[in-house]
Design a protein with these regions (language model features):
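An alpha-helical, amphipathic repeat domain used for nucleic-acid recognition
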Residues: 1-171
Length: 171
């Protein structure tokens, strides 16, 4: 199936998008959604062909599906690695969930990653909250003279980090 009327234009567009995809994959480890968005943006800004967006998105989907079949892109591994990285940074499980959703990861992969984290660690949210406190020098790591003064501010920082009120009080 050839979505464009001119076969040489179609082949040229496909090869240029494949080249862009491979060069992007050399630099970064993206999810499927991130790669699709990147290729579409590059097409709209740099290539600017005569084919419609619908035809281009079909070509991009085909390229991404090919890469997934070749196991060059794997959203499950991406989800696991990002979830572990976010946990090391001090993200709460809620914030990890939200960040992965924004990156276009499927819900089943997100749930699997969070379950793996829960199996590995005892109270991952509490550990992450302590890491956040250490990084921002808030809560128990703030000088004792200033703790009561900055209590509300510290609670707000933890709440914006995705931690529950009870957990924030415990920290």
């Amino acid at each position: 199936m050839n979505p464009t009327s001119n076969k040489s234009d179609f082949e040229e567009l496909t090869t240029s998008l494949k080249d862009l995809a491979y060069s992007y994959l050399e630099k970064y480890s993206p999810s499927k959604q991130q790669l699709k968005v990147f290729l579409l943006k590059k097409y709209l800004t740099k290539i600017k062909g005569t084919t419609s967006k619908k035809e281009v998105s079909l070509i991009i989907d085909e390229i991404v599906n090919n890469l997934e079949k070749k196991r060059i892109i794997n959203d499950e591994l991406y989800s696991d690695s990002k979830a572990r990285m976010f946990l090391k940074r001090g993200y709460s499980l809620n914030k990890i969930n939200q960040s992965l959703r924004i990156k276009g990861i499927e819900d089943k992969f997100i749930k699997q990653s969070i379950e793996k984290i829960k199996e590995d660690k005892i109270e991952p949210d509490f550990v992450s909250a302590l890491k956040l406190c250490k990084r921002r020098r808030i809560g128990p790591l703030r000088p004792t003279a200033n703790r009561e003064i900055f209590y509300k501010k510290d609670m707000g920082i933890l709440a914006r980090g995705g931690f529950s009120f009870e957990l924030s009080k415990r920290v």
